[in-house]
Amino acid sequence: MLDPSSSEEESDEILEEERGKDVLGSAASGARLSPSRTSEGSAGSAGMGGSGAGAGVGAGGGGGSGASSGGGAGGLQPSSRAGGGRPSSPSPSVVSEKEKEELERLQKEEEERKKRLQLYVFVMRCIAYPFNAKQPTDMARRQQKISKQQLQTVKDRFQAFLNGETQIVADEAFMNAVQSYYEVFLKSDRVARMVQSGGCSANDSREVFKKHIEKRVRSLPEIDGLSKETVLSSWMAKFDAIYRGEEDPRKQQARMTASAASELILSKEQLYEMFQNILGIKKFEHQLLYNACQLDNPDEQAAQIRRELDGRLQMADQIARERKFPKFVSKEMENMYIEELKSSVNLLMANLESMPVSKGGEFKLQKLKRSHNASIIDMGEESENQLSKSDVLLSFSLEVVIMEVQGLKSLAPNRIVYCTMEVEGGEKLQTDQAEASKPTWGTQGDFSTTHALPAVKVKLFTESTGVLALEDKELGRVILHPTPNSPKQSEWHKMTVSKNCPDQDLKIKLAVRMDKPQNMKHSGYLWTIGKNVWKRWKKRFFVLVQVSQYTFAMCSYREKKAEPQELLQLDGYTVDYTDPQPGLEGGRAFFNAVKEGDTVIFASDDEQDRILWVQAMYRATGQSHKPVPPTQVQKLNAKGGNVPQLDAPISQFSGLKDADRAQKHGMDEFISSNPCNFDHASLFEMVQRLTLDHRLNDSYSCLGWFSPGQVFVLDEYCARNGVRGCHRHLCYLRDLLERAENGAMIDPTLLHYSFAFCASHVHGNRPDGIGTVTVEEKERFEEIKERLRVLLENQITHFRYCFPFGRPEGALKATLSLLERVLMKDIVTPVPQEEVKTVIRKCLEQAALVNYSRLSEYAKIEENQKDAENVGRLITPAKKLEDTIRLAELVIEVLQQNEEHHAEPHVDKGEAFAWWSDLMVEHAETFLSLFAVDMDAALEVQPPDTWDSFPLFQLLNDFLRTDYNLCNGKFHKHLQDLFAPLVVRYVDLMESSIAQSIHRGFERESWEPVKSLTSNLPNVNLPNVNLPKVPNLPVNIPLGIPQMPTFSAPSWMAAIYDADNGSGTSEDLFWKLDALQTFIRDLHWPEEEFGKHLEQRLKLMASDMIESCVKRTRIAFEVKLQKTSRSTDFRVPQSICTMFNVMVDAKAQSTKLCSMEMGQEHQYHSKIDELIEETVKEMITLLVAKFVTILEGVLAKLSRYDEGTLFSSFLSFTVKAASKYVDVPKPGMDVADAYVTFVRHSQDVLRDKVNEEMYIERLFDQWYNSSMNIICTWLTDRMDLQLHIYQLKTLIRMVKKTYRDFRLQGVLDSTLNSKTYETIRNRLTVEEATASVSEGGGLQGISMKDSDEEDEEDD
């Protein structure tokens, strides 16, 4: 240990000053210190304060008056300061009052200091020699707690990550998760409060994030080759990197390892240091007490324990004699109490007896075996306890080291010499050989023997040079009789020389070291005489042998003997110093061992040896009387004063210096005090409270759990000093309750352990084998039970703040379990579930009010912060609605957190808390009902026919409908009742609005396609089409009938309907119907019947609106066709194609807007489809009729060339005459070309502009067939006439081009090569042959025969 001499001067001065203040004196052995809570409170230890209820409970008993009277006897005297030539004070009474207060303060501080020093002595002894407890290795490891500064650092690191200031690469999903974690968890005031309470660790932060992301990751779509677990582990690794920041992970790991080690096993030095801090002991005070108490001497500590246990047995007998019992709940417990006291001491004796005798100074925390061997403990029957000589056999180890020899003069320098060594009865060893000129070795021989006085022989030999010599020549020898007390260093010994050796002055330098076995406590030569043993006054060699922790014997030995000659078992003897006995010569310093009927007198040769013997025997006898050397008594008497005797054994050479130092510094009273005279219940209460303060202020998130080292010391203290288990746990519970009530986070499981122990004890279940119950224990238990119930109910009421984000893990469940236990009337009868539910229901009802009040306050703070930016903004209905929506978001967030973090008992498959889910649902409904009041108030002030409140419904409904417990609950139904009329009104107005827009739109419809309209609009960024969930239609007209503005194509329409070329009115109609249905669908109306009604109504509305659109388009189509040209100049207008496209869109939209899943509702869709099909057929028929009319016009022109008409003859004559002089153009080709151009253009326009291929095919098929039928009919009418050459050329060109054009447009061959076409082809072929014969010039290359050249020429 450290030498305290360095601090001695300074400490001496300090304590000399303090001694002038008159130290509280105490009686030599009797003053019982009774700690007072007032003095403890003035000690200034962190977090102590006043204890409130229960203050001073432990200060009862009879000790309080003793301490106070002792203090009052010699306190600071005000007169000593007021005397002398001091100027007169204007107000002596005031000054004296101040002095009195100062005196009382100093007196309390001194009393507190002395109490702590005394307590530290008891704690030191527990640490130095534990024999009951060990440091537990199975305790849950506590995490390092987060401080406010660390929390801020973590916030900054996450903010830096979100700002992109770190090197950590992350995708958007992870960024969103971190953003949410940062906003919801790290910035939460509940987390700040948890940090302040000391219950937040880095592991808590990590677990909350892990739980936070698990749902997010599970909801992500599957990615091939990447499992969800891989994503989770990757995200957690990134989280750790953010949390750690730039810190070197190796340093963090090293720090964590070190902290983990300190949480497991502490060395003695670490424990001393810890309790110095806990009790406020200075280093030099520790050093003085350590040395004076001989804490490094296990024999002294074991002896101290034996004395303490003997004192406790005597105290039990005294209590029984004087009938000074504590007040028990039953009179019959008094006798039981004595039995328990004795039984507990016997158990401690058994524990001590089971300790190995060879226990050294090292600190072994092995599991101690409980011995049930009562024969050694029972001191009544000596016959059972007698030792035989074989019981005290000792085993010694000897080391013999031969250094060198001197005096070899007669031998030649080169002669070989060597030595042998042996312990009598053992083997013989030999050194190496050396020359006579330099006989040095340094050789060690190791021996073992059972002789207490062994004979060690060392012989010196030289090698014989004679031829016939059989053995070497012995030159000399030495025989030594070492003892464990012999000098250990090498010494010169004169050798006994052999007869024929000329060198007579041989000396040998050697060392003999004989160890001291652990069970040999002292040895040496003493003069002795006794009645039963050692009956002659004679000097003998004695060994004090420890056979077991409670059995010692004084044994006398003779040389070369393993067993003692005689022995005296020291049980029941008392050793003390005596004066020299007359008539006994041979010893100088006398002492004796006395027992009823026997006295043994011992004498040593000097005073020092006597002190050592008395000290060793004092430890062995276990006597209460402390022998004081006559020299020490003289010293004490010379100093004067009534100083208590020293408990620490004092020697003239080592112990005396420590004792003098301790006495000089006023420590002797703490060392010599008898532990049995103290109220250990109140002392333990104090040390446990101070230890808890220290624990809660260290760097661990302990939640009230002591560290293993602290548990070990407190366990040992309780066992060694007889602190009742119930008292210990009651004090612990009270201290924990005080901390919990002041905001510290305490583990409910820890409270449960102590409460269950106390409840079991108070109800007579003997959890620690103690059956007696005091009235004080019962009363304190009932008081603490009530305090605990109030605390637990308060914690459940404030569960969001006492267990934020479900931390500490399992704490809420443990709190419910503990409350259920607290509500039990006894430990056997379980409390009815309904009673527990009633209590918790009441708590959760209050919790709803607390949570909503705090949420409203938070929302108002947010609102005020925003209003600060918008100063002067009035609280309009819109503002109220905006605030309500924000409040709804917070309400949902709270309910989601409750479900995620506070529904743990419901997760359990067991039925212990199966009802918790129901109560949490009730809590949620109560919470929502409070919100409903504010929501209703905000909705009431909204103007009529406004739809801004629908997002509020969507927000709440989307949350409620997915919650199994809240869906269609009380609040959910209230929400539906509130919004159902609004939805109906909205649909009514939308229906009127859309109907009106159809009516007006078609009146003004230009039938230009939307593409053409939007291509002329300015290029703008297209918004997200999913955003406008509620169509922004001006339906809030006071008259109620919505007035639709003139349609102008919005910028988004091209993006949505990029493939369509419908009209503006139709596209607007379809979008509005779709938006309305999407909006209603997105409402996800929870009530099935009303939802179906809404859907059915919207489908019917869509059906009616589309039907109206189709009919209006059909009418417009017919009107448009009637206004167009009937000649080959006709070109299919864009509007005609747009109308076809409206039909296409109508059919596509009807599938989506009019169809329902089940039964009769399909009729809407099928009716509209039939209408569209019929209308399209009619439109195709009308258009084909238009084409046929144009063809008939062409054929009418050709009819003028019929054979026999005036025009035909005139034309023929004119052409023939003119052709002689000029090149006349081919007659009829202009008509044919005009028709072919009309057909091709019409085909191209229709193919390009109409979006439905099926309609085009049907149109072309019908058009081709109708055309061929008209031509065939025209030719049939002229069956008897030969076609004019011009008619023939025109028809051939028209028929061939029509056939090829329709084939290119995809008309099937089966349609093209119809019988009608074949009839036409055959007729024209015949006519062509006839013409080629009758006309000399022929047809000028025009023929019905297929020819590529002709095609090229014609094209």
Swiss-Prot record:
Keywords: Calcium, Cytoplasmic vesicle, Exocytosis, Lipid-binding, Membrane, Metal-binding, Phosphoprotein, Protein transport, Synapse, Transport. It comes from the Eukaryota. SUPFAM superfamilies: PH domain-like. Present in brain and adrenal glands (at protein level). Specifically expressed in neural and endocrine secretory tissues. Strongly expressed in almost all nerve cells of the brain, although it is absent from glial cells. Expressed in the cardiac atria, but not ventricles. The modification Phosphoserine is found at S34, S89, S96, S259. Disulfide bonds: none annotated. It is a peripheral membrane protein. Residues 1179-1355 are annotated as: Mediates targeting and association with DCVs. Residues 1-16 have a biased composition (Acidic residues). It is found in: Synapse; Cytoplasmic vesicle, Secretory vesicle, Neuronal dense core vesicle membrane. Residues 96-107 have a biased composition (Basic and acidic residues). Its main location: other. GO terms for molecular function: lipid binding; metal ion binding; protein kinase binding. The PH domain is essential for regulated exocytosis and binds phospholipids and plasma membrane. It however does not mediate binding to DCVs. Homodimer. Interacts with the dopamine receptor DRD2. Interacts with RASL10B. Calcium-binding protein involved in exocytosis of vesicles filled with neurotransmitters and neuropeptides. Probably acts upstream of fusion in the biogenesis or maintenance of mature secretory vesicles. Regulates catecholamine loading of DCVs. May specifically mediate the Ca(2+)-dependent exocytosis of large dense-core vesicles (DCVs) and other dense-core vesicles by acting as a PtdIns(4,5)P2-binding protein that acts at prefusion step following ATP-dependent priming and participates in DCVs-membrane fusion. This is Calcium-dependent secretion activator 1.
